């Protein structure tokens, strides 16, 4: 049983590591904090693994744990007032010219800064949207109806558009 959990946990970490890191990068300001937050998420997934009941999909379950840990971190330490992103970690293909690379990095940095200014519920929806999740899964994770998810996302997109174009 314990060995099966270890294998299952390893598969989860292998499959979802990048997704978890992206979410952690919104809630943690610097690379060290992101690593710590990632470790907290992994630990919470490991602790909760025996209680996984398969009522929701594994991805939905992992999102819930990840987002709950990240939001608790944000509330506990109050570190996120204005987010910054480490642009060294952004992978940009070598065949683009340098000016496009700089422009893209600046746009991404500005987007993360705008996301950091949102309230927790809006920030959560944006993160789920950026993960390209269907409204049904967003609804399962947040507890909002699918229609409410769509309405809130539309409003948040307008807020982000305004923030990005200031």
Specify the residue positions occupied by each region the protein language model found:
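Internal acidic/polar
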Residues: 80-104, 134-135
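Structural recognition of an alpha-helix C-terminal capping motif at a helix-to-coil junction
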Residues: 36-43, 56-68
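Hydrophobic positions on the alpha-helical face of helix-turn-helix-like DNA-binding modules
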Residues: 41, 65, 125-126, 138-139, ...
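Sigma70-family region 2
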Residues: 2, 29, 42-57, 76-77
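Arg/Lys-rich amphipathic alpha helix in sigma70-family domain 2
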Residues: 51, 64-84, 104
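A short, charge-rich alpha-helical start-of-domain segment used by transcription regulators
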Residues: 1-22, 26, 35
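DNA-recognition helix of helix-turn-helix
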Residues: 140-166
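Short amphipathic alpha helix immediately N-terminal
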Residues: 117-137, 141, 166
């Amino acid at each position: 049983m314990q060995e099966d959990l270890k294998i299952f946990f390893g598969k989860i970490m292998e499959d979802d590591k990048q997704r978890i890191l992206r979410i952690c990068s919104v809630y943690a300001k610097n690379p060290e904090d992101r690593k710590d937050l990632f470790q907290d998420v992994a630990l919470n997934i490991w602790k909760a693994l025996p209680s996984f009941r398969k009522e929701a999909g594994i991805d939905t379950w992992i999102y819930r744990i990840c987002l709950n840990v990240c939001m608790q971190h944000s509330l506990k330490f109050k570190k996120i007032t204005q987010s910054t992103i480490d642009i060294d970690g952004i992978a940009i293909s070598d065949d683009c010219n340098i000016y496009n690379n700089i422009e893209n990095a600046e746009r991404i940095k500005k987007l993360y800064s705008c996301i950091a200014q949102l309230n927790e519920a809006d920030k959560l929806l944006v993160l789920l949207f950026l993960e390209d999740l269907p409204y049904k899964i967003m609804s399962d994770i947040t507890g909002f109806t699918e229609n409410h998810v769509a309405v809130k996302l539309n409003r948040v997109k307008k807020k982000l558009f305004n923030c990005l174009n200031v």
